């Protein structure tokens, strides 16, 4: 199985590349900037130049690839053309895959993306999902809720530095099943390698759901210190969002706040574990826990800090 990974420098993308190389797969990475992706080449991946904004560069990248793993993210930049440009890029990738007659197309979407269609990046994901399903290519659509790695900058790092942690009002009611990106990569590769697993969507979730209050408590426990927690009123977010919506240069942040506000009103961002298929249940038992992840993170960081103090 030869893989072409798009978005290989992302949190999940780099883990997929690393795991695939360890497992002996031939891995090509579509990149626009070879310098930023140099570490992928050092691992053993083949870098091929391609620009999603220039569809003519894509077909040559797909030659010889049996599976496409698209982990690329949508970036809204242009107020007037954000949707048309970005969906054009995503569909150009799909067209190149169809022409190359790939055996399977692996895509990543947002859980319940149809509920947040007022956010362009989410609408693009939803529309691309429908296009992929109608394309006739064998596909897998994964819907991750969040990765452990993203929580370090949001919670762990500020707490370790005694900096304030910001949370939204009422957001403690939101329960999210985060997963380690390394475990997610293993699941993606295992599912991709099985020919009978096709034309379905998969949740990429951990074995426990967390709210921000419990995550903060966990970080404070392992850090051995508390940090101030600042609660941002939803009403303030609403007014800021309304103001930003009037200006083109702040429209991207406006869309982000729209999504944040919508998510804060969701009561539970998880899947019913009882309804998961047998394949996912096998991996659920092997997943790395958030407790162990943070324990390792803080032990490593605090250990390095002690060494620096001793060497001072």
Curated annotation (Swiss-Prot):
Family: Belongs to the NmrA-type oxidoreductase family. Ycf39 subfamily.
Protein known as: Photosystem II assembly factor Ycf39
PANTHER family linked to this entry: PROTEIN HIGH CHLOROPHYLL FLUORESCENCE PHENOTYPE 244, CHLOROPLASTIC (PTHR47128:SF2), PTHR47128
InterPro entries per UniProt: HCF244-like (IPR044256), NAD(P)-bd_dom (IPR016040), NAD(P)-bd_dom_sf (IPR036291)
GO cellular component terms listed in the entry, alphabetical order: chloroplast; photosystem II
Record-linked Gene3D superfamilies: NAD(P)-binding Rossmann-like Domain (3.40.50.720)
Organism expressing this protein natively: Cyanidium caldarium (Red alga)
Function, in words: Involved in assembly of photosystem II.
Transmembrane segment boundaries: none
Signal peptide feature range: none
A GO molecular-function descriptor: oxidoreductase activity
Coiled coil spans: none
Protein keywords: Chloroplast, Oxidoreductase, Photosynthesis, Photosystem II, Plastid
Location of the protein in the cell: Plastid, Chloroplast
EC number(s) on file: 1.-.-.-
Root EC class: oxidoreductase
One BP term from GO: photosynthesis
């Amino acid at each position: 199985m030869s893989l072409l990974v798009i978005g290989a420098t992302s949190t999940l993308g780099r883990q997929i590349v690393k795991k695939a190389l360890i497992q002996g797969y031939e891995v090509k990475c579509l990149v626009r900037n070879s310098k930023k992706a140099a570490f992928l080449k050092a691992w053993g991946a083949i870098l091929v130049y391609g620009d999603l904004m220039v569809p003519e560069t894509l077909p040559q990248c797909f030659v010889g690839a049996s599976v496409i793993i698209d982990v690329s993210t949508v970036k809204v930049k242009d107020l007037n053309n954000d949707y048309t440009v970005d969906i054009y890029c995503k569909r150009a990738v799909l067209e190149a895959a169809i022409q190359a007659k790939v055996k399977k197309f692996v895509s990543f979407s947002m859980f319940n993306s149809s509920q947040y269609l007022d956010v362009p990046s989410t609408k693009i994901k939803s529309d691309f999902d429908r296009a992929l399903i109608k394309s006739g290519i064998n596909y897998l659509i994964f819907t991750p809720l969040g990765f452990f790695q993203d929580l370090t900058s949001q919670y762990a790092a500020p707490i370790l530095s005694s900096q304030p942690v910001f949370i939204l009002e009422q957001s403690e009611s939101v329960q999210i099943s985060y997963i380690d990106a390394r475990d997610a990569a293993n699941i993606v590769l295992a599912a991709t390698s099985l020919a009978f697993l096709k034309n379905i969507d998969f949740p990429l979730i951990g074995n426990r759901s967390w709210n921000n209050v419990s995550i903060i408590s966990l970080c404070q426990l392992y850090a051995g210190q508390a940090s101030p927690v600042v609660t941002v009123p939803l009403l303030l977010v609403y007014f800021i969002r309304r103001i930003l919506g009037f200006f083109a240069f702040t429209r991207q942040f406006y869309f982000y706040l729209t999504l944040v506000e919508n998510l804060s009103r969701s009561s539970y961002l998880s899947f019913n574990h009882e309804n998961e298929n047998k394949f996912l249940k096998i991996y659920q038992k092997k997943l790395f826990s958030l407790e162990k992840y943070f324990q390792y993170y803080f032990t490593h960081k605090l250990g390095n800090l002690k060494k620096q103090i001793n060497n001072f």
